[in-house]
Amino acid sequence: MDKTTGLLARLEYPGRLIAMGLASAGARAVIVYAITGRSPSSQARKLVLRDRGIWVQPTDEDVLKKGNVDLLVYPALLFGQEGIAVSNGKQTADIREGLASGAGPVPVLAKALAAWDFEPDAPIFTPRISGCFVRGSAGLSLVRRGESGETLRSYFEVPLREGEGRLVSTYEGPNREPLPCFEGEPRRMALAGTTPRETAEAVYRALAPAAPDKDFRVAVACVSASLSRPDDLEVYIINRTERT
């Protein structure tokens, strides 16, 4: 069991996750975005490459409407000449706007997310997880609810070491009620594979359940970008609905 499989296999239900790091071969940044879902509305989605980004779109409009559409449909990744923005919500657009500021990833995230709170999905209050790759560097962010209801914002530099990444997810992993939200610093993980396809497939396999009737996987996307030319992209997407 490699470090990718080992970490992700322990997460029975991670919700959505972002992993960022450096490819195991070549000077390319890697961004992984994955969706898992328990409810029918969360499952009724897919990732689609369009309009200079990767968008979360419904596979069944009627089923999706049974959930909170505002939280279920959004741009997961947006590409710009200066870099890449990624998140689990509509805050992705604000992050992309900040990529052209000339600032590094942490200042870009801090400014873009200053007005964003955790998701209004009581009693869980799902965190907003975000990241960006800009100016040859990467960063991650976690916006979550504190014990007294306050908004806690954390920002992290992501070290770019060959074959290694950092991961944040919306939930800690146990599938129980209420879902325990992610806390602390991003988890260290190996980035398996030398291409976006190999990395996406490794993540998709690692998220497979022990019991087939509890397969929460929805989609996985992997993007690699040149460190010197962030608009030089390679993309691979896996949608579970297209594999069954």
Specify the residue positions occupied by each region the protein language model found:
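Conserved short alpha-helical segments that host acidic/polar catalytic motifs at enzyme active sites
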Residues: 1-244
